Amino acid sequence: PSYDPNHTPATGESVDFCPSLWGGKDWPPAAYNPDTGLVYIPANDNHCGVIEGREVTYMPGSSYTGARTEFTLREPEGNIGEIQAWNMDSGEKVWSVEFESHNWGGILTTAGNLIFSGGTSDRFFRAHDASTGEELWRFRTNSGIIGVPSTYSVNGKQYVAIQSGWGVDAAGMTARIDQQRGTRTFVPQGGVVWVFALPD
C-alpha cells in the first residue's frame, strides 16, 4: 500500500481531539421515525482523546497502532452520553436527553410515538416521548444494557424486548471515566432477556 506522509502520525508528536475514538456516534444503532421525521442517535460527546505517535514493536495478539492513547473528559463534571433527536429535513437538533455516563444503547422507535433505549451504567431501560424526549417510564435491569431493543406483537398485544449484560467497550470505558473522575462505578454482570407488554 501507499501512504501519504502528511497524514501519518509523527513519532513523538501528539494530537488532541474531541470527541474521542469512543465518542460522537459509535456502534449502537440509531433509529428513524417517519411519523416524527426525526432520527434518534445514541451519542457520547463529552470526552476527548490524545494520540501520540511512537515507535512500537509488533507483538502478535496485541494492539499495534504505533501510538499511545489517552482519554480525557472535556468537562469533568458534565454529562457524557446523550440521546439526540435530529430533524432529517432541516438538519437541526430538536432535543437531547443527557446522561452522566456513556450511552451504549441502541434505539428503538415505535408507531406509538415512543423510543426505547438502555445503554447507561445506571442499568435503566427507558421509554421516551419521541417528539419531545420526555422520559415516560424506566425499569432498572440486573445489569447494564448494550443490546438493541426489539418489538413484536402476539394476538394483537405489543411487546418490547431487550437483552441486558454489560461488557466489552462499555465496561472498559466506564473504568476509564471512573479513573478521570475519581469515582468507582459497579455494574453487575449477567445476561437476561427482558420482555415488557405495552399498555392497550
Question: Which residues fall in each region the model found?
Answer:
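Beta-sheet-rich non-transmembrane sensory/scaffold domains
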Residues: 1-200
